[in-house]
Amino acid sequence: MMKKRVKRVLFKISGEALSDGDSSNRISEERLSRLIAELKVVRNADVEVALVIGGGNILRGLSQSQSLQINRVSADQMGMLATLINGMALADALNTEDVPNLLTSTLSCPQLAELYNPQKASDALSQGKVVICTMGAGAPYLTTDTGAALRACELKVDILLKATMHVDGVYDQDPRECADAVRYDHISYRDFLSQGLGAIDPAAISLCMEAGIPIKMFSFARHSLEEAVFNTVGTVISSAEGGQL
């Protein structure tokens, strides 16, 4: 169990968490329903919940840039728009379940979402609203991991939880390629960076290191959001003396 009371968290949710893998079904009703149900459980445990949603189920900016010969800036902006589509789906599903929420966008889209403002978002969290952050960091060449780290720092969360669909933490090698890869229960920010581990954008690690915000990376395919918040799962990245949360 967690050693300290967690009051405010930020989930970084992969866009793939909303897809069932069917190329014609970018947002799965079953996957969306599961995510909404699990967000409700965490919120009902008196935890303030913010989340940054990816857009990989719809479009990945870098891969589109390479495969379609679209320039990188445009491709990344298209990827940011994909996160807004996912955020709108989440907000509407939360509304259907009578869960108060605030849909925000890093870039101005006044007819679709409220322009992200750290103080307004923090106030909304204090009021019990789920805050959905879309459009990543709001600039090309920056990943949604970095966007999530920025939001985590601005909102002063207790922990950033990165949910993935493929691996259950940070390994010394890519477990999808190396059968003998070893998973870390805990690794320090500096060791993560010095070893060049690729599970999380190093810019995101650096931001959280400066702010002293631990990161937990876990498998959303294996664990619920509640387990990620309250139990010892996945890998924690924190200060050298931080240990597993």
From Swiss-Prot:
- Which pathway does the database say it acts in? Pyrimidine metabolism; CTP biosynthesis via de novo pathway; UDP from UMP (UMPK route): step 1/1
- SUPFAM superfamilies (alphabetical): Carbamate kinase-like
The way its activity is modulated is described as: Inhibited by UTP.
Spell out the subcellular localization from the entry. Answer: Cytoplasm
- Record keyword Nucleotide-binding present: yes
Keywords for this protein? ATP-binding, Cytoplasm, Kinase, Nucleotide-binding, Pyrimidine biosynthesis, Transferase
Catalysed reaction, written as an equation: UMP + ATP = UDP + ADP
Q: Which GO terms describe its biological process?
A: 'de novo' CTP biosynthetic process; UDP biosynthetic process
What Gene3D superfamilies does its record include? Acetylglutamate kinase-like
GO MF terms listed in the record are: ATP binding; UMP kinase activity
- Give the E.C. number(s): 2.7.4.22
List residues binding ATP: K12, I13, S14, G15, G56, R60, T164, Y171, D174
Detail which positions bind UMP: G55, D76, A137, G138, A139, P140, Y141, L142, T143, T144
Protein name, as recorded = Uridylate kinase
**What is the phylogenetic placement of the source species in the record?**
Bacteria, Pseudomonadati, Chlamydiota, Chlamydiia, Chlamydiales
| Primary gene name | pyrH
